[in-house]
Amino acid sequence: MKLIKAVRGTKDIIGEEAKKYIYISNVAQKMFENYGYNFVKTPIFEETELFKRGIGEATDVVEKEMYTFKDRGDRSITLRPENTASLVRCYLENAIYAKEEISRFYYNGSMFRYERPQAGRQREFNQIGLEVFGEKSPKVDAEVIAIGYKFLEKLGITDLEVKINSVGSKASRTVYREKLIEHFKSHLDDMCEDCRDRINRNPLRLLDCKVDGEKDFYKSAPSIIDYLFEDERKHYDDVKKYLDIFGIKYTEDPTLVRGLDYYSSTVFEIVTNKLGSQGTVLGGGRYDNLLKELGDKDIPAVGFATGVERIMMLLEENYPKNTPDVYIAWLGENTSETALKIAESLRDNDIKVYIDYSEKGMKSHMKKADKLETRYCVILGEDEFNKGIVLLKDFSTREQKEIKIEEIINYIK
């Protein structure tokens, strides 16, 4: 019978990868909650219209990458390709704006895009992100960027660069859009097929061209910063000022526009040179118009998302691996029940314990304990059982001592 395998573009997270995933998730939870963010979980599928209106019908995500299907009720359903639109829907549907002036949320979950699978980019991938609703202050933009940078730094990831830009408002982008089209139309013959298609439909994405972006006529394109209105320019300048206060170094990148249409004002990416062409580790920005587009509510918002798989590729070997604190080695028929009671007693005191229920010799037990990288091994043989003691071996000091069973917890804690 043919073995059924995981679908192309998906993968199991097991072994060391699973340990990395748990570590990243735990660091995110602790850090985000320290900043006052609350966890929220949204469904992995939504009405297709949410993403068409939220992300933008002219984006690559909506045009080429969404997993969309009809359910048995003939409704068009899409597996979420990103989570911001879903969080906006959740925020509006549950009228959270009526309960609190400012809302801070974070999330962690699977997203789905039909892309060519490659290192760090799968068709099912995991994202961690956060969003702030109800606050327009540039201080919040700077805080969100700072949290993203410090999160990656906390994970031990180095060689990071923060890139920032402003894409203005719909009004200022309209003026800039015309100047951009005018500039690129004189270079149509030298542009890639995607850019020729985008020039009238989504001209800002021309700045993000991965094929010809290094050519001189791309580099000489007008900068959106020169077309920002006075209040938009002040907001951008204030974001930079508060980034300085947060101690975050940054580079201004006038070609940075992000790939989703809902962004306005501040946009940013955190990049590294360690991932080749997939250099962006984390990205986000402000999307003050999205809540009006999806729910007719004039509520500002800002946030970011990061791909967990890409972070996993960057993690060094010195991350905490969630290994058991204690391995229990029991020897002989009469010791297993007592060993089990010892294990439960330790677990009740928040001590991580591994116990193997199959009979083994001492050599096999030691080999297993070494592989699990536990600090302690509790050895319970027939002699120890009869005396009411155990042998406690500390692998970090190589010391071994006899202790009473009821005193194990005091020695280990």
Curated annotation (Swiss-Prot):
It is found in: Cytoplasm. CDD domains: HisRS-like_core (cd00773), HisRS_anticodon (cd00859). It comes from the Bacteria. Pfam families: HGTP_anticodon, tRNA-synt_His. GO terms for biological process: histidyl-tRNA aminoacylation. The keyword Nucleotide-binding applies. Keywords: Aminoacyl-tRNA synthetase, ATP-binding, Cytoplasm, Ligase, Nucleotide-binding, Protein biosynthesis. It catalyses: tRNA(His) + L-histidine + ATP = L-histidyl-tRNA(His) + AMP + diphosphate + H(+). GO terms for molecular function: ATP binding; histidine-tRNA ligase activity. Its main location: cytoplasm. It is an enzyme of class 6 (ligase). GO terms for cellular component: cytoplasm. Its EC number is 6.1.1.21. InterPro entries: aa-tRNA-synth_II (IPR006195), aa-tRNA-synth_II/BPL/LPL (IPR045864), Anticodon-bd (IPR004154), Anticodon-bd_dom_sf (IPR036621), His-tRNA-ligase (IPR015807), HisRS-like_core (IPR041715), HisRS/HisZ (IPR004516), HisRS_anticodon (IPR033656). Homodimer. Belongs to the class-II aminoacyl-tRNA synthetase family. This is Histidine--tRNA ligase. It comes from Fusobacterium nucleatum subsp. nucleatum (strain ATCC 25586 / DSM 15643 / BCRC 10681 / CIP 101130 / JCM 8532 / KCTC 2640 / LMG 13131 / VPI 4355).
